[in-house]
Amino acid sequence: MRDNHYKLFAREDEKARQRFERDIVRMIRQLYNCPCIGLWVPFNEGWGQFDALRITDIVRKADPTRPVDHASGWFDQGGGDVRSVHNYFRPLKVEKDNRAFVISEYGGINCQIPEHSMSSEVYGYHQTSEEEFPGAFTDMMKTVQGLVSDGLCAAVYTQVSDIEEETNGLLTYDRKARKA
């Protein structure tokens, strides 16, 4: 899907798009010397995405030293330096592309430990018990490691710790219990 359908992406307001362009350049200039930033991601999962190819050019001009994931996870426009996929439901695999292939979100193994949770509500993609979580996580890591020989360049497990209703972290919300 092309990302110039501004209404569909909730970007009808031209002034808001202009502010985004101004602010992303300001942000890059402010954070340019932070060594922990390895990659710029102007759009994640289509939230407010618009003109990603043109925005990638703006980002590259502001910082030509770092790669760009122009549209992380969803509405890939064929630009940027990586092909970025979010995959919680399908078998993990490498898709062939001329860019580096990255599984930029995967995991979602839900394991709620009630006494360490923020909420009684739970959200996750694969339900497990406290006893099952370490094995499920290890199996997923083995699958990801096996994809390196197929061309996988990076992978990001979601997520390090539980947040409010999402209990798919390696640590609980209060950081007092480690699940794997």
Stretches found by the model and what they are:
Residues 67, 82-84, 102, 169:
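Generic structural signal for residues positioned in beta-strands
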Residues 36-40, 95-180:
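Substrate-binding clefts and catalytic carboxylate motifs of secreted carbohydrate-active enzymes
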Residues 72, 86-87, 105, 174:
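Residues at the C-termini of beta-strands that transition into short coil/loop
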Residues 47-51, 57-60, 79, 88, ...:
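Solvent-exposed, non-transmembrane amphipathic alpha-helical segments
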Residues 1-82, 91-97:
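Active-site mouth of glycoside hydrolases
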Residues 47, 75, 89-90, 107-110, ...:
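Short, solvent-exposed loop/turn segments at secondary-structure junctions
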